[in-house]
Amino acid sequence: MLTAQQIEKLDWEKVAYMMPVIVQHAISGDVLMMGYMNKEALNITISSGKITFFSRSKQRLWTKGESSGHFLNLVNIYPDCDNDTLLALADPIGPTCHFGTHSCFAPAQTEWGFLYQLEKLLASRKTADPDHSYTAKLYASGTKRIAQKVGEEGLETALAAAVNNREELTNEAADLMYHLMVLLQDQELDLSCVIRRLRER
């Protein structure tokens, strides 16, 4: 997180004391929005943990989500190499855009952003009707059955690679990823847990 010393080192004069801030989803990497912060807005953002801008149209401080409840919870914030732009990593509560989309730049989405949305969808299927959802049926079948499916798909993925069938390898890898994500959700885990463990190694 930015220190008071780093905040003072930002090139405020260059940007007329209105620092451009790009807000990026801390997990998916999707760019959510951009806005401007003066020093007060930046200090409030860091102290409150909720991204706060200076609204040039309203001429006042504005905490994203103050009326809708769709806050952008601050994870971290970084200056760029010229100290005239900030990148804020955030955990959004609800949609970011006032049009109801996840990003003000929708439908733009990264590949990792799709995985994040898929993970949210799989989590929501835990309470769905097993008669109308294959994923819900998997959850209802229990952990052992889900784990068995991961094993089966892993074997099929390996066999496709062994015979150099790239098309089938892609298909089987997708099936394996899907079932692995279901298993992680079943165990109250997610891809972020796996990524953190990989970083530790």
UniProtKB/Swiss-Prot annotation:
Phosphoribosyl-AMP cyclohydrolase: annotated segments: 1-114
Database matches in Pfam families: PRA-CH, PRA-PH
Enzyme class: hydrolase
Residue segments, region Phosphoribosyl-ATP pyrophosphohydrolase: 115-201
GO BP of this protein: L-histidine biosynthetic process
Catalytic activities: 1-(5-phospho-beta-D-ribosyl)-ATP + H2O = 1-(5-phospho-beta-D-ribosyl)-5'-AMP + diphosphate + H(+); 1-(5-phospho-beta-D-ribosyl)-5'-AMP + H2O = 1-(5-phospho-beta-D-ribosyl)-5-[(5-phospho-beta-D-ribosylamino)methylideneamino]imidazole-4-carboxamide
Compartments, as annotated in UniProt: Cytoplasm
Annotated keywords: Amino-acid biosynthesis, ATP-binding, Cytoplasm, Histidine biosynthesis, Hydrolase, Multifunctional enzyme, Nucleotide-binding
Protein name: Histidine biosynthesis bifunctional protein HisIE
Organism in which the protein naturally occurs: Photorhabdus laumondii subsp. laumondii (strain DSM 15139 / CIP 105565 / TT01)
